[in-house]
């Protein structure tokens, strides 16, 4: 027997074929959401209030300071928030201090700043009763980027861009004449020396002294028309504010506010970190020769002589001195924006090769490591980035790859919320300033100054309508988990589908261990929406990190120390793969090892290896790592497999896969669909609706009983996608449980493991051509035994409003409706729970007042005799739609009188939940986990299905032609291993990239007493004869997908029509008709089917009068009358007339035909028939 037994949770043991030991447990898979939101509550909010505080009025007399904030208790718990359609939120209160400097008076007050949405424990938000997820956004990191470009003559040039978090961009570029230009905030370009002069380096000599002599600078100075600071300032002002009269003072303040005002320009922590890293002097000194002596200014010690080659070892010795004080000098400005001040920079001279002179000296300038808390761009940054640009022109330094994950970062929930909150606060700040100047400073209070509307509005807007705030995909727990770990490059400040090219979408070597190379949607979003890899974490700057095992450089042994590396840190190391063979002491078995260095796979000696992968599955995401034998599948099909698992419908009786990967337990636990214990303890009570756990606490080494935790279970709740969300306990009374153990299974879970489908007996064979083109043949057993039966819950809503003619009423007393239609309604007119409903049945009886009409003399007489007051009401009851039959699961009633919060104008709201049990059906879509999908074409009786020698009929027949061209061989290996596992009565785990080998599969088949090739003789169920060849038969895990035929089947006789063209609407949602398009018309024309064609273009479509009369004729059994003129023709003529054309319609004998509108007689016809020919609003 190969493999070892591993316990997954309390209830499941699997035989694992993994050869690599797990050295690191998987992190909590929804940490990306919860940790980010926690940061926002603890630090993000405080940062925001510090940024905005203090707010001063224009005179400086009044000062408003934000001191502290606190979050109260939410009004309703999570479940109740969903039920009441409200937001799960807590009140945010801020302590504010108002200081009047004239009188010295200080007022403190606590101000309510609105209800702030809270994150649930499972990483979601409840907004207006709907569960939503905030997707993390992948954006370019603020930094300075250098790239190479070729001009139209093929000449090499460079561009540089300084990108802030918010503020003006600064771009450098060269032209064909080797002049360096700068663009400020996408305006017209000016020579870069103009910007330097404006900063305060007025003369040519000052600029040359600052940057060092070189020909590019000389060319730029010659092109520069300005020769002083003032002229340079005016030149820039004219470019930035064309048309305004330029003055030196205005120009100074404009540049000052554009770049050096922290409120207008923000690099954020990450921008400062990246700029300091990029412009650090050590990056450009590596492998260069010094052109000057490096001396320690404090001790006078010579650290390196002129001409020293700075290799890795020499540079490592120099770095501590370079970071302290070596090479620092002060550049003095003589005016300009910086007035007369000192700019601290660091400069070292080196030799570079030159075509003409052999070699020359250039200056390498860094920004002198500007302090981390300077969030705007510093003058030293501008000088150093220009110096780097000149160095690149001389071949020193590196360009950047913008698709590298070192240059792309994540904005998670916390940061997205912070940015939105900042917008609201800045709007509020403006209002506060205005109110300060208007109101009397002696009687004013902080409460009167602050208007919280803009803050509340910006938060509501973000949660309600931002592209990144999405309705949670709750089809099954895996869909839920993946949605929370999704990374989107779209959204505000990101890319758009149309602009994104191939490079951005492509897999990059830096994705390794950070972003899954498999899981991404097919279609226009491919590569723009990704998923976090299973072990990846996000660091404080928003860069993705992946864990590696450290290799001890002294001994060359792999240690148990784990380091999390970002993509650009990893570029400096050689990393071995997780499957490199190790001795017991951690040393490598082989002398030469396959390793990665900067995206290249190379063979290196083992003493050069710095790190080793933690696990083979760190490359892929949670959903992808649920596919066994992933290593045997083509990546395109694996992509479909990963995506289709998310569309699996939760079944009535879920079953965990016989052939799993070991990830089923982890993903089920972290998805949020299971009930997980918060503390260790003992189970005291278990019912279908709740589980009680008594905590066990250790005090002085002794165990004592603590508090009682009560966990509520969800029973048959409707998920966001209309599937059934049901939890079942899997622990018993008296069980001792650990912290974070699964207490109850959620939907699509069995015994604490993800269970999206069922293990069924599959044969790869054809059957009378019914599985042509990936179609699937099913056995009737799967229908009879409810193997693929799923439960679907639909919600219907009806409200009683106040109308101009009086209030609507929910009642059992409905006009023109027989007692039979009311049999299931209670005395209030609402359907009873448990009633069976067919489409068209009344769910909620409701009447709406009609306009009062003038009565005729006869009617008045009758009313006078019988005393009956005319009840002028319309029947507006809620009825079950087509395909909406089922059983009433629950009814919820909300009344304004009972204190329920309802929208304005609504007095009563009734919600009816109808549950459907859907068996598997022809036309449903099914799939395996390897991208092998198909539609059910035929359900055969059990007796017709081919059977095994022992008489067992197979459950499913798949087409063998679906395998070779698709190259997803994993399904065949799964089939054989599944059969062996069924025979042995075990569950197996075959982890991705470290699973069962072919030998393991054949060995397990032999162990189970089967043929080594896994093939069997099959007998035809119809004749009892054996088939000619032996067939691959085994157990495959097949799932039923959310594309069900019941949702797609649709038929219409009459229904709503479009208002303008009077043609039937389209689509099932509108109860529309089938489009008979241009090409279909050609088909009928080709056959000369004139009457059919006339019928389709008139009475079946938009001949308003004709269709009413045709309906009448059919009802009375008379001949169908002659069709009239289609409405769309009348619309066309009206359009032509509106263009000023005189269009008339002539008959064949040149007589003009009058275009009549509907006359009274025709009106009465439609009234008599009482047909609903208008747009039916309830169906829209």
From Swiss-Prot:
Keywords from UniProt, A to Z, are: DNA-directed RNA polymerase, Nucleotidyltransferase, Transcription, Transferase
Tell me what reaction this enzyme catalyses. RNA(n) + a ribonucleoside 5'-triphosphate = RNA(n+1) + diphosphate
Q: Where is this region: Disordered?
A: 1154-1180
Q: Which NCBIfam families match?
A: PRK00405.1, rpoB
Q: Where is the composition biased (Polar residues)?
A: 1167-1180
Assembly, per entry: The RNAP catalytic core consists of 2 alpha, 1 beta, 1 beta' and 1 omega subunit. When a sigma factor is associated with the core the holoenzyme is formed, which can initiate transcription.
- HAMAP family linked: RNApol_bact_RpoB (MF_01321)
User: What's the protein here called?
Assistant: DNA-directed RNA polymerase subunit beta
Q: Which residues lie in Acidic residues bias regions?
A: 1154-1164
GO biological process terms held by the UniProt record: DNA-templated transcription
> In terms of domain of life, where is this protein from?
Bacteria
Kindly list the GO molecular function terms attached to this UniProt entry: DNA binding; DNA-directed RNA polymerase activity; ribonucleoside binding
Q: Does the keyword Nucleotide-binding apply?
A: no
Give Gene Ontology CC terms.
Answer: DNA-directed RNA polymerase complex
Q: Which InterPro entries match?
A: DNA-dir_RNA_pol_bsu_ext_1_sf, DNA-dir_RNA_pol_bsu_external_1, DNA-dir_RNA_pol_su2, DNA-dir_RNAP_su2_dom, DNA-dir_RNAP_su2_hyb_sf, RNA_pol_bsu_bac, RNA_pol_bsu_CS, RNA_pol_bsu_protrusion
- According to the entry, what is the taxonomic lineage of the organism? Bacteria, Bacillati, Bacillota, Bacilli, Bacillales
